[in-house]
Design a protein with these regions (language model features):
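Basic, polar low-complexity surface loops/patches
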Residues: 1-113
Length: 113
């Protein structure tokens, strides 16, 4: 996916803000998507098919199964940030923010097992 696409610019901006090594789950409609290196790491952990859009690796899963996949990340010692659209901007993309971070240390209190 071209870095020039507005959605990819939003994704990369958030990716730069979160701690290094944290997997970014980016909600697009009814799916959480992972791109680039996060997709390559997530695919085997979660048992997801790694695909590509252009040169960009990607994978994803339905939003309603997020706790199932969070548990898989936590079992592998990975921290995860979930980003969602918090405000439509009228340009078809919207403003995204991290709405939740789950780490191996916080997973139990968030009921992720």
């Amino acid at each position: 996916m071209s870095e020039q696409m507005p959605i990819m610019r939003s994704y990369l901006a958030i990716k730069r803000e979160i701690p290094k090594g944290t997997i970014l789950l980016f909600r697009l409609g009814d799916f959480y998507e992972m791109f680039g290196e996060d997709a390559k790491i997530s695919s085997p952990i979660c048992g997801l098919c790694l695909t590509r859009r252009g040169d960009t690796p990607m994978c994803g899963f339905p939003y309603y199964s997020v706790n199932t996949y969070l548990a898989k990340f936590i079992r592998c010692g990975k921290s995860v940030a979930l980003a969602e659209m918090v405000e439509p901007t009228g340009n078809g993309v919207g403003r995204y923010e991290v709405v939740r971070i789950v780490t191996p240390g916080t997973a139990e209190e968030e009921n992720v097992k």
